[in-house]
């Protein structure tokens, strides 16, 4: 359980200790874990277990994952947005916000396991920072992304020189769950993937919404490169300071 410490009285010697612990915890660097290709259910179960067992001193983490083909439906999602139930792609009902989306090979998924109370960060502000991290990531590859009011995620800007018919297409989706002041789930960015499965759903509940990837817009970068850039952008936007993230090796990489 993600605990928020109870503040003792100013006279108590434990007050300074609690304050120091909170300060130390907030100052801890975000740990980036490269989990690679992983079944969605395994990631989902691991996120819930991590969030349920963390303490106030637990370091925040970002998990970088690539999933085999899967549709996920948010807790208030309408199953009617799955247009082709016979696609052969499994559907997993999850506890994040939002409607239905697709995850598959060639998509970078970043799961944000953050203690928002410790960071004094509101959910709306976290969403804004995640979206800005995606915009910054796209800009690193000379792509222009933009927000749309009332529709979380990032879309191809009409200002993108080679956008053509893809202007307004969705290139990144996000959805979060907050439990006891801690976040899990996160953001997905389409790098180079088979986009056909998106035709079997109303992406994020929007009928006829086009979904695009970076490769379609002329970007030749690989999954690892984009994942590294996205992780650094997420940390920079969440912590407000530049971050360097190493490429995957073994275990965890601390940024």
From Swiss-Prot:
Keyword flag Cytoplasm: yes
Enzyme active site: 204 (acyl-thioester intermediate)
Gene Ontology cellular component annotations, sorted alphabetically: cytoplasm
Keyword check for Translocase: no
Enzyme class: transferase
Site (Lowers pKa of active site Cys): 170
Cell compartment(s), UniProt: Cytoplasm
InterPro entries named among the record's database cross-references: aa-tRNA-synth_II/BPL/LPL, BPL_LPL_catalytic, Octanoyltransferase, Octanoyltransferase_CS
UniProt cross-references to CDD domains, sorted A to Z: LipB
Region of interest (Disordered), residue spans: 1-21
BPL/LPL catalytic domain: residues covered: 56-242
Pathway: Protein modification; protein lipoylation via endogenous pathway; protein N(6)-(lipoyl)lysine from octanoyl-[acyl-carrier-protein]: step 1/2
Catalysis: reaction(s): octanoyl-[ACP] + L-lysyl-[protein] = N(6)-octanoyl-L-lysyl-[protein] + holo-[ACP] + H(+)
Record GO terms (molecular function): lipoyl(octanoyl) transferase activity
Chain positions recorded as substrate binding sites: 96-103, 173-175, 186-188
Keywords: Acyltransferase, Cytoplasm, Transferase
EC number: 2.3.1.181
GO-annotated biological processes: protein modification process
Pfam assignment, any one: LplA-B_cat
Misc. comment: In the reaction, the free carboxyl group of octanoic acid is attached via an amide linkage to the epsilon-amino group of a specific lysine residue of lipoyl domains of lipoate-dependent enzymes.
Record function comment: Catalyzes the transfer of endogenously produced octanoic acid from octanoyl-acyl-carrier-protein onto the lipoyl domains of lipoate-dependent enzymes. Lipoyl-ACP can also act as a substrate although octanoyl-ACP is likely to be the physiological substrate.
Family named by the database record: Belongs to the LipB family.
Protein name: Octanoyltransferase
Organism encoding this protein: Paraburkholderia phymatum (strain DSM 17167 / CIP 108236 / LMG 21445 / STM815)
Phylogenetic lineage: Bacteria, Pseudomonadati, Pseudomonadota, Betaproteobacteria, Burkholderiales
Annotated gene: lipB
């Amino acid at each position: 359980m993600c605990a928020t410490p109870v503040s003792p009285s100013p006279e108590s010697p434990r007050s300074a200790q609690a304050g120091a612990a909170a300060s130390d915890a907030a100052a801890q660097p975000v740990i980036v874990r490269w989990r690679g290709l992983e079944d969605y259910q395994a990631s989902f179960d691991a996120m819930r277990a991590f969030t349920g067992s963390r303490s106030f001193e637990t370091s925040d983490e970002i998990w970088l994952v690539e999933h085999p083909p899967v549709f996920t439906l948010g807790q208030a999602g309408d199953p009617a947005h799955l247009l082709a139930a016979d696609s052969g792609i499994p559907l997993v009902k999850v506890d994040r916000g939002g409607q239905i989306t697709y995850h598959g090979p060639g998509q970078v998924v970043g799961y944000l396991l953050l203690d928002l109370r410790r960071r004094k960060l509101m959910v709306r502000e976290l969403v804004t920072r995640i979206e800005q991290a995606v915009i910054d990531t796209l800009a690193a590859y000379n792509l222009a992304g933009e927000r749309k009011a009332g529709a979380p995620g990032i879309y191809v800007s009409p200002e993108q020189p080679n956008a053509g018919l893809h202007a307004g297409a969705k290139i990144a989706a996000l959805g979060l769950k907050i439990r006891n002041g801690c976040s899990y789930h996160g953001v997905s960015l389409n790098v180079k993937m088979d986009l056909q499965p998106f035709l079997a759903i109303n992406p994020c509940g929007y009928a006829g919404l086009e979904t695009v990837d970076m490769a379609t817009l002329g970007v030749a970068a690989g999954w690892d490169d984009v994942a590294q850039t996205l992780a650094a952008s997420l940390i920079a936007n969440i912590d407000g300071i530049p971050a360097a993230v190493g490429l995957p090796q073994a275990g965890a990489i601390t940024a």
